[in-house]
């Protein structure tokens, strides 16, 4: 998502395929250069516009640079992450799982002019898992399932 919002994605080592340079959408003034190291890491960051702590995970393979990186989306361990367009209306980040953070989600929706709900992500997940477990208990013969699996 973040990388394709930029102007170009270059892959000189052919990590993701044979195309050396791919044109992005150009919504952010950034360029990404693919690198061999893929990073998938649980991350805690601070969303700069709201000051909210964001818990999520970071996925990226490469380095993104450019003018819009001077307006980072967040910081993690005092390292800037992401970019915000000069207009302030387009942003990108390597952070995933942002909307599972209740305070960030409320801030984001409010800034879109929408009324945030009081939904608690963790409570909703627990409720859904409990409902699934109840359904499975009612409709699946667990002992038969286990004996077949052996």
Region locations from a protein language model:
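Acyltransferase
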Residues: 81-150
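Short conserved micro-motifs at the rims of enzyme active sites and ligand-binding pockets
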Residues: 38, 68-70, 102-107
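Catalytic beta-strand/loop cores that center a nucleophilic Ser/Cys/Thr
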Residues: 46-88
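Cysteine-nucleophile active-site neighborhood
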Residues: 1-55
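Hydrophobic, well-ordered secondary-structure elements that form the walls
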Residues: 25, 59, 96
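Conserved NTP-handling cores and scaffolds of large molecular machines
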Residues: 9, 32, 66, 102, ...
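Short, glycine-/Ser/Thr-/acidic-enriched flexible segments
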Residues: 2-3, 32-33, 61-66, 97-100
